[in-house]
Amino acid sequence: GPSNLGSSTQRHPIRPISEIGELEANRRARWALNLDDPFSSRIYFDLNRKADGKWAVEKVTLPPVVEEGKVPPRAIFVDALGITDSFLNAALKQEFDDAKSVVDPEKVSDAKIAGLCIIFEEAKYQLRNQKPLRAMFSSETTAGFKANVEDETGERAAEFGLTVQREDSTQPWRVTEVNLDQLLTDYATRIAGGDVHFTPLVKNPAGGDTLILYFGFDENGLTPRTERQLDIVASLLKTDPSKKLTLSGHTDALGSDDYNKGLSKNRAIAVKEYLLSVGVPLTQMIAQAEGEAKPRLPNVLEDGEDNPSGRRANRRTEIYLDF
């Protein structure tokens, strides 16, 4: 077993062996022996469950030899599981570029990738040790996985679905769907005290996904939470100078129209100035003030009572990534 390895081989101190995921439900799985660097230096074992229920090694894959000055490959494996695992590990480390390199950009938006990075960073999710990626279905051109994540304590678990597809066996696998519904519900319970509207990712009525940053009542200052989210947005924008985003500031319905218009303008400007400070040029940003004209949720309930939860969801700056 791994314990017989010579002391010259440094193993990852936390988990010398980690499960990558299932290649086929309950029949084939991939594990890794972690060397000195937990992600880039690994020996992989593909295991096959025999008729008697015992597992046998089907294939061993050594880490690639990278010449000095050369960049190591982003994904060691280009099969369905390998691409899914690469995508998740990139998102967990907020490496937007690497995550984007393995998606079908027509099916998975930049906003969704950034939203996933934000959720992972803020809720401190990590892939679960046991069955991190369950194989749900697979064919020659489509495979579905269930990703199992947990918080740092291991006490709270959440899951979400991913689909990868390819045109045929000569084409690369790409992530084509990331279903975050269950993950966003868990995130809202943990981070937002159960307020499901307090989520960084929503559907844009015009199509696609929109990132949302929230503000407290009557304020336009950025919280550390918002600044961390903007750092991820900035890294996304720096990947391509031709990308533009529209910052649209919003308020709730308390206060006069003129006051709210000014407040929403200040909210959009606060976001714009922060992005400028971390190196995003002005040419990539358009700021708009909407005031209270476009609420996400009702400010007042049907019986005329105040709706604080709705007003909270309406105090926001929306970031439309118009790529």
Q: What do the predicted segments below correspond to?
A:
Residues 81-89, 97, 101, 228-235, ...:
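Solvent-exposed, polar/charged alpha-helical surfaces in well-ordered, non-transmembrane soluble domains
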Residues 251-323:
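Periplasmic OmpA-like peptidoglycan-binding domain that tethers envelope proteins to the cell wall
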Residues 3-50, 61-64, 111-161:
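Surface-exposed, charged secondary-structure patches
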Residues 26-28, 40-42, 140-144, 157-159, ...:
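Extracytoplasmic
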Residues 1-4, 90-112:
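Short, well-ordered alpha-helical segments enriched in acidic and aromatic residues
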Residues 46, 56-60, 146, 161-163, ...:
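Soluble periplasmic/extracytoplasmic beta-strand elements of cell-envelope proteins
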Residues 56-89:
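Short, low-complexity N-terminal intrinsically disordered segments enriched in polar/charged residues
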Residues 149-159, 165-244:
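Periplasmic peptidoglycan-binding/tethering modules of Gram-negative envelope proteins
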